[in-house]
């Protein structure tokens, strides 16, 4: 629905996985939209490429292989829609580059931000191995809600998502 409302032409996805979201972006974005997607996990990359080929969308989707932090820091083009669906504990580290790349009026959607609702639990209720991820996600949510350049809403459905619009 956001793609239908915003009609983005330059879309950036951080976290390709097998390419499902990128293919959906192709389906719902306006004609001529270009999708750039980033994936690090070597086993997913050939699956995503094959899915793009089978969907006939190879010309519309550019898959960048490697570490998202490194790739984001090297990008110079701005985007009018950015979708974050990568390593959840890294969102906070990606944010400075994502903000640099998101044009004024652009939309940032971050997926899985509530971690099945556990993100609102006490630090001590969260399993020890997940505490760093949850701490970083709380920091990320705080930054989104308090950054004067953004208007952000948290959508508490499933694992949660945020929808942010850059206003400055």
Question: What spans do the regions from the language model cover?
Answer:
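S-adenosylmethionine/decaboxylated-SAM
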Residues: 1-168
């Amino acid at each position: 629905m956001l793609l239908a409302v915003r009609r983005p032409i330059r879309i950036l996805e951080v976290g390709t996985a097998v390419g499902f979201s990128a293919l959906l972006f192709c389906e719902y974005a306006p004609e001529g939209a270009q999708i750039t997607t980033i994936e690090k996990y070597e086993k997913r990359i050939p699956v995503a490429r094959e899915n793009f080929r089978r969907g006939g969308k190879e010309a519309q989707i550019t898959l960048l292989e490697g570490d998202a932090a490194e790739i984001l820091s090297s990008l110079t083009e701005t985007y009018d829609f950015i979708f974050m669906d990568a390593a959840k504990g890294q969102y906070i580290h990606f944010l400075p580059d994502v903000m640099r790349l998101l044009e004024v009026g652009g939309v940032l959607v971050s997926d899985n931000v509530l971690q099945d609702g556990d993100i609102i639990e006490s630090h001590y209720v969260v399993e020890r191995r997940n505490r760093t991820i949850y701490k970083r996600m709380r920091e990320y949510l705080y930054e989104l809600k308090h950054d004067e350049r953004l208007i952000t809403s948290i959508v508490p459905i499933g694992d949660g998502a945020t929808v942010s619009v850059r206003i400055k």
